[in-house]
């Protein structure tokens, strides 16, 4: 049988507060390329991906990544920008 590959246009995941180029590459290696895919991922699943990367990645907190990605996937740019003002390194700050 021939395998059918579906071409997905990747989003710039580093737009997410807390994700830089190395984390974006790690997500891509785990088949997360789009804001929609990231928004559908559970924070625990994302933490598992980070944990596999070792200590340097384990310290990151992906708790808000799906929420941020959902806003971008839905084109809610103003809401996304408001949310990112409340975040530092992807985490909510009081």
Indicate where each model-derived feature is located.
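C-terminal extensions
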Residues: 1-17, 21-94
């Amino acid at each position: 049988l021939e395998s059918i590959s579906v071409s997905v246009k990747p989003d710039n995941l580093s737009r997410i507060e807390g994700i830089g180029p190395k984390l974006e590459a790690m997500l891509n290696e785990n088949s997360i390329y789009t804001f929609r895919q990231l928004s559908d991922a559970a924070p625990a699943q994302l933490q598992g991906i980070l944990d596999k990367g070792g200590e340097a990645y384990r310290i990151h907190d992906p708790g808000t990544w799906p929420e941020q990605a959902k806003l971008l996937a839905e084109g809610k740019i103003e809401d996304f920008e408001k949310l990112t003002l409340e975040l530092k390194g992807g985490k909510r700050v009081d």
